[in-house]
Amino acid sequence: MRKLLKPKREVGIVGYGAYVPMYRIKAEEIGRVWGVSSFPIEEKAVPGLDEDALTIGLEAARNALKRAGIDPKLIRAVWFGSESKPYAVKPTGTVIAEAIGATPDVSTADFEFACKAGTEALQTAIGFVGSEMADYAMAIGADTAQGRPGDHLEFTAGAGGAAFIVGPKSSETVAYFEGSYSYVTDTPDFWRRQHEHYPRHGNRFTGEPAYFHHIINAAKTLMEELGLTVNDFDYAVFHQPNVKFPLTVAKILGIPKEKVLPGLLSGTIGNTYSGATMVGVSAVLDIAKPGDRILWVSFGSGAGSDAFSVVVQDAIEEKRNLAPKVKDYVERKKYIDYALYAKARRKYIL
């Protein structure tokens, strides 16, 4: 049985865009409040009072459109992945599709799969375009992640997102997909039940057999199916709940950390959940050269991983400069204290 996922029509990335909120809180400031002195990251991004997963996704979508340079009416699908949607019952994708001018001849849906909801939407977009049902589809991953006050998730749960417009491979695509693979099991490592405000997790169980098992198996299977080795890749982007986990995966797979660091952003913006690998790949595309190959593996609790092999094309040289780069958002920051952070994130519910 062939495990590789590859459509009959070759598919690429026509445009990409990311967005990270301006506000930051240092892990040291959170630790000051809770009496903690060791931290998994340095600081994380915090959404403003007027920001949520929808607005983050919309900004990323607009940046992707700038790079794509296409009429938004040509986009026949807008699929949004998140675990922090502003509405429990109302699609977010319809709002974004309307705001970018893609309605009414468009399909929209909201995807959920913990931190890999965005790449799940991307897999669907690749199939949609690859089957020739449409020429363009947009996949978005964005989150404003929450952690219970005092829980170790509070140190890492950040905010950010990215959008990718998928189209037929051509001279206008900045990169193309060689193939993809999804690996899924029923592993209850992280969850939030209906009406609960904060998620729960299985502590060390979230590492193995959850994160490491799924990412490593997805990466290895993809490479085996494509006949590639780690030496064939110039960059690798893994889901990044912290800094340690993706670097550990790289070490296990035999990938030098120098190939991982350009797309590893969790140390300065936190874990952006559905946006994590999508923002990381956006950062890599901001600096990659034509011909570079990127290994891209997401992870979502519950649990599963999507793995992609992406090859950069000539169009990247011009298109990367048509919208703000990830570095621009990472360096644009304003620090807040825990009191403002708690207010902005509605940490205390009366």
Curated annotation (Swiss-Prot):
Sequence similarity: Belongs to the thiolase-like superfamily. Archaeal HMG-CoA synthase family.
Enzyme Commission numbers on file: 2.3.3.10
Transmembrane segments: none
Species, as recorded: Thermococcus gammatolerans (strain DSM 15229 / JCM 11827 / EJ3)
InterPro entries documented for this protein: ACP_syn_III_C, HMG_CoA_Synthase, Thiolase-like
CDD domains on file: init_cond_enzymes
Class of the enzyme per the UniProt entry, highest EC level: transferase
Disulfide pairings: none
Protein name listed in UniProt: Hydroxymethylglutaryl-CoA synthase
Reactions catalysed according to its record: acetoacetyl-CoA + acetyl-CoA + H2O = (3S)-3-hydroxy-3-methylglutaryl-CoA + CoA + H(+)
UniProt keyword annotation of GTP-binding present: no
Molecular function terms, GO-annotated: acetyl-CoA C-acetyltransferase activity; hydroxymethylglutaryl-CoA synthase activity
Any GO BP: isopentenyl diphosphate biosynthetic process, mevalonate pathway
Keyword field: Acyltransferase, Isoprene biosynthesis, Transferase
Binding-site list for (3S)-3-hydroxy-3-methylglutaryl-CoA: C115, T156, T206, H239, N271, S301
Role of this protein: Catalyzes the condensation of acetyl-CoA with acetoacetyl-CoA to form 3-hydroxy-3-methylglutaryl-CoA (HMG-CoA). Functions in the mevalonate (MVA) pathway leading to isopentenyl diphosphate (IPP), a key precursor for the biosynthesis of isoprenoid compounds that are building blocks of archaeal membrane lipids.
Active site positions: E83, C115, H239
UniProt KW Transferase keyword: yes
Pathway linked to the protein: Metabolic intermediate biosynthesis; (R)-mevalonate biosynthesis; (R)-mevalonate from acetyl-CoA: step 2/3
Assembly, per entry: Interacts with acetoacetyl-CoA thiolase that catalyzes the precedent step in the pathway and with a DUF35 protein. The acetoacetyl-CoA thiolase/HMG-CoA synthase complex channels the intermediate via a fused CoA-binding site, which allows for efficient coupling of the endergonic thiolase reaction with the exergonic HMGCS reaction.
Positions of CoA binding: R204, K244
